């Protein structure tokens, strides 16, 4: 009888284990919140917060708000699901910061672009060229910068393609493809 109970219990446990879905899955979206142990990701399916406590974050690139992200997990997609890996596009993290060049009018000054999280941008000391937003272009190192030019009398909206590069000394540059302007990323 005891042996029969043990067999029934073993079969029941095997059945429960077989029913749990531990196949690896991924959830891709945009980071809307992040902390030391969680990341909240939103896409068309909804918004979910994942535990990142034991996740591989070697490709997380700072988990910046607005960054495109892929979260790998197992089991059911639910609030608090444990992530096994979190990866973002490195171009997003490389882009965020102040990009400047010497100001040709003021030899002691600089001008440039401040690229911020969540797709926001601002001009630095450029009154007639106002950057407002940016987005990844989908190719490594490529961005689209958007704003308004007021230099010719009436405001004209613009979109520029820019390329991020890193030289052998680790210095990042941002080159505007339409005019060849080269900005250097400020150390922060």
Positions of predicted regions on the chain:
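Bacterial N-terminal signal peptides that target proteins for export
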Residues: 1-7
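Tryptophan-anchored aromatic micro-motifs
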Residues: 91-108
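C-terminal motif of bacterial Sec signal peptides marking the signal peptidase cleavage site
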Residues: 15-18
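Structural detector for short beta-strands of small beta-barrel domains
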Residues: 20-37
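Short nucleic-acid-contacting surface segments enriched for D/E, G, S/T with interspersed K/R
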Residues: 57-72
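Contiguous, well-ordered beta-strand patches that form the walls/edges
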Residues: 32-39, 43-46, 54-57, 105-111, ...
